[in-house]
Amino acid sequence: MRRSFFPASLSLLLCSALLSGCVVTNDYIAFDSKAAPSPQIKRYDGNEWASERAVMVAAEKTNNWQTVISVGNDVIAKNPTNVEARIYLARAFTKTGDPRQALRVLSFISGVDTAELRIERARALIALTDFEEAVKLLKPLTDGSDLQKLSAEDRRSAKSLAAVAYSMSKNYAAADKLYEELLAELDNPIIRYNYARSLYLEGRAEDSLAQLQPIIDQVPAAKPAAVAALMKLGRENDVRRLLKGELDDEKIEELI
């Protein structure tokens, strides 16, 4: 008789594979983490800010979000109107699990509407499961509207986040369209994983597995996601083969 639970050693990984109802995890939206702001944002080119910005950029590249937060707080304490610093700071708060603080940081910005501001607000809203508002913010950046001239990076970031929001709000057709566009532009393993996750939610386990197979060894969450898809399809022997060497035989049989 098939067991209806999963061993504790796999519970966190299987959460990433959608089995526990997780809404958004960092690896789900990690693709569009970036270190360079859009050219539309007002720059503060003083020597001190240039040095502080360099520290924040370097910290982002290594996911050292606490350094970004520390430096960003110092910067806006001295210059509350530094929009660029607020964007870095908001992104760091969302990445470290405090999206409400990210929105507070951005709420002090007025009279400015840029792609990056919309992207960071949407990122925080997605983390708060406010998918409808996130889609509204991102729609002008993903449907061809001329809100402003977008960089390729901003357009991909907007599409990536919008796809997450559509998927989590069960608008799978819209999510599929964006994921397919993204993968046609650039075959990115994180985007492929996110697409697989969306397909699983949609009930398309076979299609989800097809997206996961090329990235099993590239994205840590891909293997547990593949296990979830295989179990959904009743392919227990394939689960055993996939987990051989990862778990002992007894644990594998518990899982199955």
Region roles according to the model:
Residues 88, 120, 154, 160-161, ...:
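Canonical tetratricopeptide repeat
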Residues 61, 95-96, 127-128, 164, ...:
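Register position in tetratricopeptide repeats
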Residues 19-84, 95, 104:
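N-terminal leader/linker segments that initiate helical-solenoid repeat arrays
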Residues 85, 117, 151, 158, ...:
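TPR alpha-solenoid repeat register
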Residues 46, 80, 112-114, 146, ...:
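Short coil turns that delineate tetratricopeptide repeat
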Residues 31, 217, 222-256:
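Terminal, low-structured helical/coil segments at or just beyond the last alpha-helical repeat
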